[in-house]
Amino acid sequence: MDLAALRDQQRQRAAEVVTQDDFDIMPPRFIGGADVGFEQGGEVTRAALVVLEYPSLQLIEHQVARIATAMPYIPGFLSFREMPALETAWCQLAQRPDLLLVDGHGIAHPRRLGVASHFGLLVDVPTIGVAKKRLCGQFTPPDAAPGSCQPLMDKDRQLGWVLRSKARCNPLFISPGHRVSQATALDWVQKCLLGYRLPEPTRWADAVASRRPASDPLLRG
């Protein structure tokens, strides 16, 4: 596997990422969530996409795609591993979202092309990265109160936000994916929080991708 070529591709695509607001519909009528899991010891990639109506944040659709895993896990190149299954699930959606929250990083990536940015470019939709762990950048820990946040920085450039979404929980790392500004990325993640650590779109996508039981009848069967 030619990692040097993949790095070059990441840098080239990162230059195409738009970090200003460019929404087709504002406020969005439908907000999506995306997450990826793996089966059979990593041999099968399972991508989940959910669509919620806004402002009710009610789940209206979910799709799951399972395909053979394209490449092994290599830190910094996760999008190449996850994107084929995500694209397959995206093509199955009857209702495409106006905004997509992705479990993973946007521009808060060593080469500024996390899966949220990479996938946003692929399908040309506004995306936001919502990650559970830091990949790069420095920050001051946010206060303990829910809603507290601090910028995630790389020297003098802001990569995203570190958000305390729930008390007594580790913070989330929020960053623009594509066609979304820093301020708007933080704003929409906060609007999608309903008392859990994860915002509703990625919370539902995580449940579907992880195959955990869910109370909503739409997920049964």
From Swiss-Prot:
Record has Amino-acid biosynthesis as a keyword: no
Reactions that this protein is recorded to catalyse: Endonucleolytic cleavage at apurinic or apyrimidinic sites to products with a 5'-phosphate
Record site feature (Interaction with target DNA), residues: Y73
Record-listed E.C. numbers: 3.1.21.7
Biological process terms in GO annotation: DNA repair
GO CC list: cytoplasm
UniProt keyword terms in alphabetical order: Cytoplasm, DNA damage, DNA repair, Endonuclease, Hydrolase, Magnesium, Metal-binding, Nuclease
Catalytic class of the enzyme: hydrolase
Pfam families: Endonuclease_5
Protein name from the UniProt record: Endonuclease V
Organism taxonomic ancestry: Bacteria, Pseudomonadati, Pseudomonadota, Gammaproteobacteria, Enterobacterales
